[in-house]
């Protein structure tokens, strides 16, 4: 009986000692969570470029190298993409055109060079097409699109193009920047 009583006293004392430690762990703590960068731009133009169009990735499907068997051959599988404009005011400008820049292929001027690096397909580049469906060389202004008040989508597309005979399989990547011209 004396042992039971002693065990109960020890257990009570231990519980009393542990309980404050448990409550101490529940106190408030502040830790560094990270950094958020905010970027934007104020423009004096007819429209603003939507956030989703400012930095986008256009995923192109696979194409067989046999479709790109001669210099200048395209896959015939254009991939569409748009540059979306918001808050357009046609009292400021009625038309918009786009100019793309990027690393030009060294053997075929006007097209985007394949910059995929390790594992890259060879003898292939990317050809841009304007809103009118015609080829759009780098640094060439696209055909103009007539704006409406509010939101507008400027349609473009891109296709694989052979820059030499003997296209080899591999990855294809390129980066283009664009600027808008309002008139």
What are these regions (language model features)?
Residues 2-8, 20-183:
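Mature extracellular/passenger domains of Gram-negative fimbrial/pilin and adhesin proteins
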Residues 9-17:
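Bacterial N-terminal signal peptides
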């Amino acid at each position: 009986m004396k042992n039971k009583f002693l065990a109960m006293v020890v257990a009570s004392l231990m519980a009393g000692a542990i309980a404050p430690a448990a409550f101490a762990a529940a106190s408030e703590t502040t830790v560094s969570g990270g950094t958020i960068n905010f970027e934007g731009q104020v423009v004096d133009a007819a429209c603003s470029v939507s956030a989703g169009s400012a930095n986008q990735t256009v995923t192109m499907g696979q194409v067989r190298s046999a479709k790109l068997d001669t210099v200048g051959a395209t896959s015939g599988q254009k991939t569409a993409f748009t540059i979306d404009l918001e808050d357009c005011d046609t009292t400021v400008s009625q038309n918009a055109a786009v100019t793309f820049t990027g690393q030009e292929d060294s053997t075929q001027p006007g097209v985007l060079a394949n910059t995929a690096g390790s594992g890259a397909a060879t003898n292939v580049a990317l050809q841009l097409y304007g809103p009118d469906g015609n080829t759009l060389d780098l640094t060439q202004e696209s055909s103009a699109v007539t704006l409406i008040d509010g939101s507008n989508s400027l349609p473009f597309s891109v296709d694989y193009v052979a820059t030499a005979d003997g296209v080899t399989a591999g990855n294809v990547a390129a980066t283009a920047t664009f600027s808008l011209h309002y008139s």
